Each structure stands twice: as structure tokens, then as C-alpha cells.
């Protein structure tokens, strides 16, 4: 596929998702969403993230996944020839399970690893990279891909590497990605849906939008991307029943443009290191 077709495919994806989420945010959730314009602050920056994440970061992530695959080659679990042919189907007892069972287990592993990786990015030198994602003040589906490449790369490696090294069929692993990706976009949507009795069972837009809230009581809460059980077990669950999340963004300054946001985490860590020098 040439570059023009690839760029066009991203544009088509944006139009399709934009249509879907227009219905979700503006029609189905009318009266149960935060009042904000469709063309809101930061929308151009978010569009740039969609193109760069899909066209640049995603291919680099795939390249980096050769690291765990090289471990399997060195361990003689598979060979480069088998990988080239696309005939690698995993190894060990886990790969011989029914596909549906592998998929369920992969969802659990990916979400569990993602939970702890997410917590890591809320601390120390990792936070400035994740702060880019939290900088959206008018949170909606479009802002879901406002993710610094370092954050995106580490997150994908942490989630996928254990699954590959445990022997799961990589085809099954790849098949779970579109569902997880769409759901990650959905929980950023500007809708105050909490799924009623399922609010503690599956992550919802309200659950995740509390995670993005600037209110101090919501800081460092609701890290899970799919199952709130991890937050419940580890004491980071926050879902008040008497109000909705409203105020989003971060307390520290963040450049508005794409390139400024790419550089800011490095600059922030450099500034902080200078402050702590004797």
C-alpha cells in the first residue's frame, strides 16, 4: 500500500468513527453528556495524533515486537522462516486451547498488564509522557489517541510481550486488538454512561472520564482499560454516584501543538533533574 492510500485509509477511518461517535455523543447521549462544541480546543492536534500514531508509531511498535519474538527464536521455540511464512501458531499447552478461551485469557492478561503499566506512567519521570494524554480539557472520542509515542510504545510492549512469551497464538492476539482499540476510544467519549448494574464489572465512559478528572479525589484512580476489578482489588476504584466528571486536563502547563507536546516530557524531565542536582 502506498503512502497516499495509507493516508486515505486513516482519513476514511476518522470519517467513519466521527459519524459513529456523532450519533453516540450528540444523539443517543443527548442530555447525558458534557456541554462542549464539536469543533473544540485541541481538535487539530488530536487529528495529527491520529495520523502520526497510525502511520508512524504503530509500525515502530510492530518492529519492536521482534524483540520478544527473537527470544522465542533463540530459545528454538520457532524459527525466522516460520515467522516469515506466517505459520507460527504459538507453543505449549496455552496455544492448544480453543480460540475463544485463548481470547478471553488474552483480554485478562492484556488488561492486567495495562493496569500496572498505567499506574507506572502516573509516577516519577514517566508522568510527563502520560500527561500529554491527560492534557485534553474537552475530552471526547477524538482525544483518545492523544498519546505520546513513548507512552504508546511502552504500553504496547508491556501488554503484548507476556502474551507472546506465554505461547498464545499470535493470530488470536492480533484479533483482540481491534476490539480493545475501539473500546479504548469509546470510554473517552463525551457521554455520561455508567451501564447501571454493570458499572463495577466493565469500564465505562464515566469510569474512565473520572480518571481524566482534575478533581483531587479522582487523581490516580480508575487505571483499568476494560475491567474495573483491578482497581477494586488494588484500591484505586472511584465511581461516585451523585455526580458526573466535568473538569478535565492537567494542573501543569502543556504546549497546545503536536511537536511541542512531543518535546515537553523530555524538557520537563530535564528541568526536574536540574532542580534535584546538588
Give short role names for the model-derived ranges:
Residues 1-16:
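Hydrophobic transmembrane alpha-helical segments in integral membrane proteins
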Residues 23-24, 35, 67-70, 198, ...:
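Generic structural signal of hydrophobic/aromatic residues within well-ordered alpha-helices
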Residues 46, 50-51, 225-233, 261-273:
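A transmembrane-helix-recognition feature enriched in membrane-embedded lipid enzymes
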Residues 245-278:
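A membrane-cytosol interface segment of integral membrane proteins
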Amino acid at each position: 500500500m502506498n503512502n497516499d492510500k495509507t493516508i486515505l485509509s486513516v482519513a476514511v477511518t476518522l470519517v467513519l468513527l466521527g459519524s459513529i461517535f456523532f450519533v453516540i455523543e450528540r444523539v443517543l447521549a443527548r442530555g447525558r453528556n458534557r456541554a462542549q462544541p464539536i469543533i473544540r480546543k485541541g481538535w487539530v492536534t488530536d487529528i495529527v495524533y491520529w495520523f502520526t500514531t497510525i502511520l508512524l508509531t504503530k509500525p515502530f511498535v510492530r518492529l519492536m515486537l521482534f524483540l520478544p519474538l527473537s527470544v522465542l527464536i533463540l530459545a528454538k521455540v520457532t524459527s525466522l522462516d516460520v515467522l516469515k511464512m506466517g505459520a507460527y501458531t504459538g507453543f505449549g499447552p496455552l496455544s492448544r486451547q480453543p480460540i475463544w478461551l485463548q481470547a478471553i485469557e488474552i483480554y485478562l492478561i492484556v488488561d492486567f498488564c495495562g493496569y500496572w503499566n498505567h499506574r507506572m506512567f502516573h509516577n516519577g519521570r514517566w508522568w510527563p509522557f502520560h500527561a500529554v494524554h491527560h492534557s485534553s480539557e474537552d475530552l471526547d472520542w477524538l482525544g483518545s489517541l492523544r498519546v505520546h509515542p513513548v507512552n504508546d510504545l511502552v504500553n504496547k510492549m508491556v501488554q503484548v510481550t507476556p502474551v507472546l512469551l506465554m505461547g498464545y497464538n499470535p493470530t488470536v492476539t492480533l484479533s483482540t486488538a481491534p476490539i480493545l482499540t475501539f473500546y479504548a476510544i469509546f470510554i473517552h467519549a463525551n457521554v455520561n454512561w455508567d451501564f447501571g448494574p454493570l458499572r463495577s464489572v466493565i469500564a465505562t465512559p464515566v469510569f474512565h472520564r473520572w480518571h481524566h478528572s482534575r478533581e483531587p479525589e479522582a487523581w490516580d484512580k480508575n487505571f483499568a482499560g476494560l475491567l474495573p476489578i483491578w482497581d477494586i482489588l488494588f484500591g484505586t476504584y472511584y465511581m461516585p454516584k451523585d455526580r458526573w466528571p466535568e473538569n478535565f486536563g492537567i494542573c501543569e502547563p502543556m504546549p497546545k501543538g503536536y511537536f511541542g507536546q512531543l518535546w515537553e516530557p523530555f524538557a520537563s524531565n530535564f528541568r526536574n533533574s536540574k532542580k534535584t542536582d546538588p
